[in-house]
Design a protein with these regions (language model features):
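Short, well-ordered alpha-helical segments in soluble proteins
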Residues: 104, 114-124, 145, 149-152, ...
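Short beta->alpha connector loops at strand-helix junctions that form conserved
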Residues: 39, 63, 83-84, 103-105, ...
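Active-site/ligand-binding-proximal alpha/beta "capping" segment
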Residues: 90-122, 130
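A cross-family phosphate/adenosyl-ligand binding-site feature
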Residues: 1-96, 135-169, 173-179
Length: 179
């Protein structure tokens, strides 16, 4: 299974985040799954790639040309796919993924997982969309989705397939039910 993970090229200031990223990467590698991610060697992106590779897993990076020109790509990847721009990168990462996980991240992470959430809610994508809600990071987004339902702008049926989790065990449970 290809697990597309969205996360930042920064590490953030919460040590638990780095640990959770490394834990997921190790599990992906050890479980025989494959990682699809943004391709960078920096920050949390670099951490998940290293953890997956060190655990024997395959890692596909998807990076736009301008990042490659800046020499930000991870050198040890199983495969590096270079795209024209960020839009093409998002499309490719979705096409490659069987499941989608977003760690806490910045505006780029939010943009990427918002597109996945939209496709899942429209049933254009039949795959789990998982937000890793470490230390309540995504509570605001969770409340916004609930408010959409409350105001009649969405429905529980539309939001099926969107999950908020606290740890790796919950991710494993979702994947076990979905596949």
């Amino acid at each position: 299974m290809n697990i597309t993970v969205y996360l930042g090229a920064n590490e953030g200031n919460d040590p638990a985040l780095k640990q959770a990223v490394q834990e997921l990467g190790r599990w992906i590698g050890e479980s025989g799954n494959a990682l699809v991610y943004g391709g960078s060697r920096c920050g949390l992106m670099g951490e998940i790639a290293e953890s997956t590779l060190n655990a024997g897993g395959e890692v596909t990076g998807v990076e736009p040309e301008f990042f490659v020109q800046g020499e930000l790509q991870h050198e040890g990847l199983t495969e590096l796919i270079v795209t024209k721009d960020m839009t093409e990168r998002k499309t490719k990462m979705i096409a490659l993924g069987d499941v989608f996980i977003a760690f806490p991240g910045g505006t780029g992470t939010l943009e990427e997982i918002a597109e996945v959430m939209s496709k899942v809610s429209l049933r254009h994508l039949d795959a789990p969309c998982i937000l890793y809600n470490l230390n309540d990071y995504y509570d605001g987004l969770k409340a916004l989705l609930a408010r959409m339902i409350e105001k009649g702008l969405s429905s529980p049926e539309r939001q099926q397939g969107i999950y908020f989790v606290e740890d790796l065990e919950q991710i494993k449970e979702i994947l076990q039910k979905s596949f």
